[in-house]
Amino acid sequence: TKSIAGELPCNEVYIYRNFGSKEALLQAAFNRADIGFVQNVLKHIDVMDEADRPLEERCHALWDPVWTFSVGRPDIIRFYLRYYYSAQYLTSAHELHHRNYQQLQARLSRYFRSPRDSWFLMAHVFETILSFCSHILSGELENTAEVSDEVFQLIFRTLQPYMLT
């Protein structure tokens, strides 16, 4: 909490007063980031219902704003990378994450052969986005249209056998 308070114009005592603990603060921050990501996907998901367009084109039309949203928020991605892969996430926020994604999963499940698959495939997409964003943040990759398309192709080719056309 000292480092958090040091980065913000507030006293450490306010963190405890408002959240009770550092863990509760991190969980609330994770919840906010999670909801923002899900809302962004839901905002653009209607493109998947455009049956007159080929599947890959529809998926790419959904991909572009999701990728732009993700790479445009480096602080959120850094936070996700630190928290999502932590033991605290497993004990404090895993169920919250699943609740946050229920609406998205319900919507996406109609595009997959099995609703069970949609949970695992959503996690795969999310974790792939995090992974490639981390490579961009570290300078290993540049945020270019070519990289975006390569990541899209990797994800799409992985999902394609599980998708309904």
Task: Label every model-predicted segment.
Residues 17-18, 51, 69, 114:
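Histidine kinase transmitter module recognition
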Residues 31-38:
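Short, basic, alpha-helical segments at the C-terminal edge of helix-turn-helix-like DNA-binding modules
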Residues 38-42, 72, 81, 87-113, ...:
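Amphipathic alpha-helical packing segments from all-alpha helical-bundle domains
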